[in-house]
Amino acid sequence: MPHQQILMLFGLLPVATNISTWWNFGSMLLACSTLQVLTGFFLAVHYTANINMAFSSIIHITRDVPYGWLMQNLHAIGASMFFICIYIHIARGLYYGSYLNKETWLSGTTLLIMLMATAFFGYVLPWGQMSFWAATVITNLLTAIPYLGSTMTTWLWGGFAINDPTLTRFFALHFILPFGIISLSSLHILLLHEEGSSNPLGTNSDIDKIPFHPYQTYKDLLMLAMLTTLLLMIVSFFPDIFNDPDNFSKANPLVTPQHIKPEWYFLFAYGILRSIPNKLGGALALTMSIMILLTVPFTHTSKLRSMMFRPLMQLMFWTFAATFLVISWSSTKPVEPPFTTISQAAALMYFLFFISKPLMGLMENKIMKT
């Protein structure tokens, strides 16, 4: 297709005039996923999915492969950038009522689950101490499922403990899932353009729209330039900022790290898991911390779509954002008072947001009537 025709297609795509920078994170996520697939391919070429050689193959990539250190750091830090963008993208959807486009929201939540699974499998691949123990702790949660738990865990591990078959299948899953993510992302974008993007006011945009190109393309390019600058600065100057010191040691099943914790982007879910002193209860809470997003489109009761003109709801939303950060912070601390109490209070507040959101909507409707 000639260059002008592609631009014409973008030019014919109508977009609301007043969409803010928060709407740029979708295109940034697309850029992140492209980066992850490309760097991931070059890493997979040199990686060896064997428990005796995996750790050494990572060292080989960073030391001996030309620009291997760059590929490895771009892939690891790119994952963090991906999660920063996706959490902002979800927060924007919650704040401005984008979830009322139900199909788009449900496909997006499925994408989040797939992304979290992919990131978890990827974290296991270097076969460092924290990789091994994080895999042990999380896969062990399957044993909490009544009747089927033990069988499912053995099936997932490929044996009676985490071993070579586990690493091989995790590598296979880590390689194949991104293609599922790309397919579902295409569906997500397709469903979005059935109705079109919402806007900060939460009103119908049909009366005031502009062409996507050149206005939004340049806006997207500016944000992409900022994201790329931030990514390259971290890769160049602080490459180990998101890494756990324990993961620089090879996996040893006989030595348990003092404090097992996942990557920062899973800390909120891990904090919710840890706040319940019961295996099955914790596993259910962990699952619900993500699955509860699926309920949001069906529990919207307010007559207003966006939170822009709902001060009480804004207060609740920013309390929820602070709660998310508090859970993440408390998860990095040892399992002892006061951190356990903080985790439990924050986990309760996390779920209370989703429970009180429809009630707040009904209350606001009553206030508007009077």
UniProtKB/Swiss-Prot annotation:
Query: Mind listing the UniProt keywords for this protein, alphabetically?
Result: Electron transport, Heme, Iron, Membrane, Metal-binding, Mitochondrion, Mitochondrion inner membrane, Respiratory chain, Transmembrane, Transmembrane helix, Transport, Ubiquinone
Where's it mainly located? mitochondrion
Binding residues for a ubiquinone, per the UniProt record?
Answer: H193
**Keyword Transmembrane on this protein?**
yes
GO annotations of cellular component type = mitochondrial inner membrane; respiratory chain complex III
Cofactor mode of binding and number, as noted: Binds 2 heme b groups non-covalently.
For this protein, the parts annotated as crossing the membrane are 25-45, 69-90, 105-125, 170-190, 218-238, 280-300, 312-332, 339-358
Instruction: Describe its partners and assembly state.
Output: The cytochrome bc1 complex contains 3 respiratory subunits (MT-CYB, CYC1 and UQCRFS1), 2 core proteins (UQCRC1 and UQCRC2) and probably 6 low-molecular weight proteins.
- Any idea what this protein is called? Cytochrome b
Q: Which organism is it from?
A: Chilabothrus subflavus
